[in-house]
């Protein structure tokens, strides 16, 4: 798992997300506490439970983006799920236990990649030998049996050529593991686990089958390295490591949790609201979930929930669930200054993306400082007049601004366009002043 300090985590998040310092600090401390817990002795480690987080803030301010970036930094089993996908046990729809099953699958993939990377050197050696065997087959006697030949010098010459890439385009015939059977099983909602088990059964049927293929040396090397690395990894040990990683370092990001709040005016059973909250309680508190890889305890899995809470309030969550989300972080609405920074500061910002896209057509785009400021003001004004969708509004406004250039770019190779205040006003001014802003409403 990640050994980054909270300050380093916040610094990394700052490269992609503007503002929201409180939320960044909260997730950074939570992530670091995962590492701190693993340094304790076993008895104390068992007692230290994660402090789950509830992020509250309007749409488009960075809640989901924090989760996306955190997933890359965590280097631990991580899954992001929408709370609205689940229903109460006994009704049609996904059950909340599938969260832990999906998290375990993610851990298996993560651990397998890590283990295969460790075995890469040995796998490369084995793959190299198999390719040399295909390039320099042993002669056969009159009975069709292979005879060992002393071709060590020739083998060394070919090994040197292989490592230098001189044989990359040469075609050889190899026995490679057959691709797993692609079986798509349709099951009623809520029975995904049965579908997964049946798919695993069909895939195992053809697991040890070999197939002769003609393939170029470069492609053969990649395929053989993967095959040899997979052979060197112990599947049982891999499962144990993955389950341990889930239980100790697993992180679940539960988005749109405000959508499963029971609203006061509603009547009748809310199978996808309060029932889901009740089903989430044991997961968040700590229980044991049966997965196809083994039993998984959820006592030390970190849950980060988020929601806009525009209609519902955090207090509309059932009290037991509120108590299991002790750390509350409020994200603030974005201002014009924030929009201006979003357009220029993050890695691969919107302006950088459009410049790179147009450069493929030979068109140069230059954004002036006053042009970016006017664009930020335009997005903020539209948000104020209609529905406030936060930074997502920049995509809509930017696409409208660049519409003409994008359409004509292929005929205007070599030209330069300067996006300044006048250009923004000319393309967006009337629409911003007009009360009918349907073009901007997503």
From Swiss-Prot:
It comes from the Bacteria. GO terms for cellular component: HslUV protease complex. The keyword ATP-binding applies. Pfam families: AAA, AAA_2. SUPFAM superfamilies: P-loop containing nucleoside triphosphate hydrolases. It is found in: Cytoplasm. ATP binds at residues 18, 60-65, 255, 320, 392. The keyword Cytoplasm applies. Keywords: ATP-binding, Chaperone, Cytoplasm, Nucleotide-binding, Stress response. One of its GO terms (biological process) is proteolysis involved in protein catabolic process. GO terms for molecular function: ATP binding; ATP hydrolysis activity; peptidase activity; proteasome-activating activity. A double ring-shaped homohexamer of HslV is capped on each side by a ring-shaped HslU homohexamer. The assembly of the HslU/HslV complex is dependent on binding of ATP. Belongs to the ClpX chaperone family. HslU subfamily. ATPase subunit of a proteasome-like degradation complex; this subunit has chaperone activity. The binding of ATP and its subsequent hydrolysis by HslU are essential for unfolding of protein substrates subsequently hydrolyzed by HslV. HslU recognizes the N-terminal part of its protein substrates and unfolds these before they are guided to HslV for hydrolysis. This is ATP-dependent protease ATPase subunit HslU. The lineage of its organism: Bacteria, Pseudomonadati, Pseudomonadota, Gammaproteobacteria, Aeromonadales. The gene is hslU.
